[in-house]
């Protein structure tokens, strides 16, 4: 930008005239001639376009204000880049830059043409943009009309005319398509062109389906992007994100395809298995075949089978009649069933047959690849997957839960979060680039301002009235000067001295910290008062809350008034919090005045905003509000883009499907009334699109496909899901996560203490002072009494007083930090008993060193164990008691050197050696596992198996005795002090106590008491003891303990946020969700019959016993249950029922009417945006960031892996650590050699890959109940593929011999081939002799193994799977922790919910009756799926359940649940699993994805090193690690990019200076390092990489150590060049001497100069030269030939080689060029 600063005195803005155009043309002509003359590209020397002078941006302030007469007229371009091109600029009124071509527009209109100038003026005018924007918005409003009026057609013509006029103006001013800044060169103008073209097409040409074409009009909404400049940028970022999704999308589609194929093979046709009523006339006549569609064999053989045919016809009609299927209450689809042992069973009189259609209109099935793919995609996106899970397990069996576990963990947790990672990374890169650009601009602006200051000084010297900087500052004042004058007069109140004195007094009061404390307490009390509102309330309580509201409103009003008086309005409203206070107080006062006005009760909700005032004194809440504020600011454009996307898809849905919903409504609704989710009008279409953005799309899509056809609905819904949910919302999340770091969620000490902290500190100091003097007074009284009996010296007394004062003067903060530090989490380990006088703290520190303790550590990660190990002996027990205990009870201090004390010491040492023994540790772990496993058997069937019950009772006693024994041994070994100072030992102690109390109660016969039963459920915590014993789980818990403060902070803030929405929900919906219900017909009584509760109660009193006034279980009757409602809405489970009740609600105790309160949907929309999108995603952010902080404190080590797992992780990350392998030798046998050549060619691998793809396609076309012909064709195709792959396997074994099994992929291929052959052979046997379709299906899965071979050839997929492999150790540890949590909650669920009534999602398969069923339910709700359906029956209370009903086989009575326990159980599990543990999965996957992406985005990756060594094998068949120097050129040419150096490459290789070892050989690592440096360049990172690679290679290949280089390629070349130079110089010298001698001899002969001495040296040299290079008289051998024979060896002596300094490569090349030039 410094280059853009115009020189002083220069004319910056010049009109664009004909002479300007001629000047540009002259410059272009000169440049063209120069280019032709020098044959070089002059354009390369031109500067880059200035980013600040781009079209559409405002003119930088450094150019000053352009003269008014130069606005809206063509000017010469001020960008140096364009000054030599045919362009000009126009500045609009707001100094916005517009750039145009100087060429003639449409070959007709020059830049100086009047028409074009008018068009330009219209185009750049702000009113024109506003007019177009208003037109677009009006057009959008018309598009939302589902039933437009007749005159709307006229409006369409008007809109089309306006858009045509806009395009015409653009084309006239810019040109159409030829030139850089013409109309069609801007991609956004393509949109305009397409919109206008489609408008004319639909009017002029009859194209059939007009409704489809009319939807193209919605693209006009995208024109807003072209009008609002900021939107183009964010759309560009979105497009970049989508481009980067390529690999992740490919991997996702591939994995989904594989899973869909597995689902197709395992579950094809299963979901058609239904419970069909057995007709009475068929009993005894037929035998049912469960696998046949007919389902029977006839037993009767009458004449010509007449009766059998009749029965066949009747039976066929019977089983295809939906009325004969079994339906559960409230379900539209019949009950599914299966025929395996663990599948769902049919009720009595029903049989399981495969008949009828699939569930959900037939769209949920695995019957073909397409439907299976849709089902798996639904499973991956976790939309209503609990339904698919239940249907599949009910038909196939519970064993297949494994399939769902794999798909959820791989597909949902991994693949979906890969998309998040890619989008987040794309945003991060863009953000970094923006920040870098901003930093660069900042530096440039500093220089610019310096230049402006100099200019200002010059202007001041010339006495100019206004400088540039002053002008700039004046321009940036917020208000006109008149407003400042008004403010000084009316908003600053300085009347007289007494008024100022009053103000000072008021200021001192309102700014006092204690006043702030009082206001904060009032805010909290006000919030409590608002939260106490509930339904039903007594009149007195309601009056109390009303008075409380008046009081608090008065207090806050008074605070505002006093602050305004104290600070003056001018300064009061300068503070943001004061503005906020004034708004809330004003609304509160308005609400009081309008309290009785109907419909304005929503104003009461604004009082809730006072809660945010807590942020002034609560740093975490303040930071969260700032985060949301920053995010909303950054999300402004993105929100607008999302709104446009939602609008477009809503209009598209309404235009395409709205009419179909109305016409075909009977297909999806029994009473032919539009369902709640439809697209017949814009508002409902908007709700469906918003629901899809929330992740719920499948149910709406089923309805759409049923009424409008499958293809179009699939396309629209998939587009909304991918664009809206996966891209835009993930970008929202990326922006949110980038808005904060973990440091933001901690108190900012730099800002100093706020008033609240000052007030609290004052109170603490006052309390401390009071406490000190009370203690001193008490001490004085007691001492005076004691001194009468004991003589105490004054010095000792003074020392005690000082101790008391010192103790009490410690602040509470320090006391807390001392007692709640990391030491509480350390492991107490006993060490040698000592009588030393060290402090307790030092003893604790010394006693916490050994990690072998049974109560293992939950040490925070940042504590380094090495620091503690220096002083540790830890071989003998520590003291039993603390020093205080010994001082208070001296008899505890026993002399351990003699007598009983010595015996006691020996006993302790024996106990210590026992508990420290590894065998004891292993035994205890084994007992923990056994005791935990025993809990799993205590299900509802235990009473039926008395033997197992007896065994479990005895085992429980044994476990209790063993754990008591372990506890006592540890008491003896470690002492009470060490044992009870450790959290894990406390946990052990409490769990043992529970078992002990339970056992004692059983022995005494009190086991049936309610309290004892409740206590027994706590035995479910027994598996927690395993946490400290398994290192993998322990490291995860360590990380979690470190994250707990941040998680708790976010949880607390979320609760505050949700409190506002919960209180608002109570205000809006309390008492309005009830309805009058007919228990017999299971229907709500119509409002025409019963209008409210009073009428319903009257109906009940009139002996209508089947009628009940019921309430929705999850409602807003109080704040507590409101929280539960919000949790269901935030997790999108059960939220639709709550919304339905809300939009149907009228008044308190009134019957609901269908969608009477339609716009209450907006309450839920707003909560989902702020309560779900923001707050729940904060959990992800804080967990990721906290773990990153912990990792940084540990020096970058992974906090989720044990030391052994870190070794695996590092092995996975090794780069370049391979060594050359000896290639498989070509067989000598000619036939084998021929086969070897075939299988090692690349074309062979390509051919096999193509066949694998074809095999995948053939598997995809398989369907349920396909024709016999198709089945036979597919069978033989499968046989052909098996033969081909078997042939491939055989050929490779023949060619590679034993080496075949040394390659992992070959072993995989071999296993797949064997399994395929077994599947082919066993299929017939299984079909003939067994009736086990499960085994048959599992065998067929082997075919899918072939598809996985595609991974071998897909680099991008391998990179992403490599990230997964790196994540496995940490994921395994977190999986273990998740399993432990599920195990504990399963046991707890079995204890409390085993007998609840079967309704909603609890049925005969999904319940808490057995451990297996509990685990299935908990796995389902780990993703939050279906937890509302499991909670609903548990919340049943009489009369919805019967507390006295008998449960067969047990003494337990009743089928009611416990609402309080159920809510606590599910809420806790959702928070622990869904919000914490699952987010830990996400954190690890994102981190390892980043690592893998960085490696794959590097210029070099693992594949390149692999390619290097594969090529090396061809040049070094013996794997000696060396090749000849002569082969180097060919080797480097044979390599593939990026390592390849194509021939001719001799000079390049010489300049790389590769070390040579004896024998002119080069080592592979030296070549690899040199090539790597060539690709990456020289940098510190390169040096580090070199060192790492060399170190790894040396470790793997010690053979390199014995070879030391004696030279290098560059040195060798330098030696050769030096020798050549010396040879040439020497020959030249000899030749010169020879000429001189010849001249001397000639002169002697002709002139006879006898006095001249002959040059003897020269003569001697000439003689030598003659001997060396002269003619041999005997053979007449030429000079050159003799030189070749003798000279080379003799001249290349060591003296000559080292007589000259070595030349570097550049010097050598220079010298060579000089020599060649001179020659």
From Swiss-Prot:
Lipoprotein listed as a keyword: no
Disulfide linkage: 275-337, 346-352, 666-672, 704-713, 1076-1096, 1441-1456
CDD domains (UniProt xref): Na_channel_gate
IV repeat residues: 1224-1521
Single Gene Ontology BP annotation: neuronal action potential
Catalytic reactions of this protein: Na(+)(in) = Na(+)(out)
UniProt cross-references to InterPro entries, sorted A to Z: Ion_trans_dom, Na_channel_asu, Na_chnl_inactivation_gate, Na_trans_assoc_dom, VGCC_Ca_Na, Volt_channel_dom_sf
Regions of this protein lying in the Cytoplasmic compartment: 1-126, 174-187, 229-247, 422-513, 564-577, 618-633, 733-919, 970-983, 1030-1046, 1181-1243, 1292-1303, 1352-1370, 1486-1719
UniProt topology in membrane: Multi-pass membrane protein
IQ domain mapped to chain residues: 1615-1644
II repeat feature ranges: 495-766
Region of interest (Disordered), ranges: 28-50, 834-862
Segments annotated as I repeats: 108-431
Primary subcellular site in the record, as a coarse category: membrane
Record bears the keyword Transmembrane helix: yes
Per-repeat ranges for III: 900-1215
Positions with biased composition (Acidic residues): 834-845
Intramembrane sections: 369-393, 682-702, 1120-1141, 1411-1433
Segments in the Extracellular topological domain: 146-152, 206-211, 268-368, 394-400, 533-543, 598-599, 653-681, 703-713, 938-950, 1003-1010, 1067-1119, 1142-1158, 1262-1272, 1322-1334, 1389-1410, 1434-1462
Transmembrane segment boundaries: 127-145, 153-173, 188-205, 212-228, 248-267, 401-421, 514-532, 544-563, 578-597, 600-617, 634-652, 714-732, 920-937, 951-969, 984-1002, 1011-1029, 1047-1066, 1159-1180, 1244-1261, 1273-1291, 1304-1321, 1335-1351, 1371-1388, 1463-1485
Subunit record text: Voltage-gated sodium (Nav) channels consist of an ion-conducting alpha subunit which is functional on its own associated with regulatory beta subunits.
Domain notes: The sequence contains 4 internal repeats, each with 5 hydrophobic segments (S1, S2, S3, S5, S6) and one positively charged segment (S4). Segments S4 are probably the voltage-sensors and are characterized by a series of positively charged amino acids at every third position.
Family, per entry: Belongs to the sodium channel (TC 1.A.1.10) family. Nav1.4/SCN4A subfamily.
Protein name, entry field: Sodium channel protein type 4 subunit alpha B
Protein's organism: Takifugu rubripes
Gene name as annotated: scn4ab
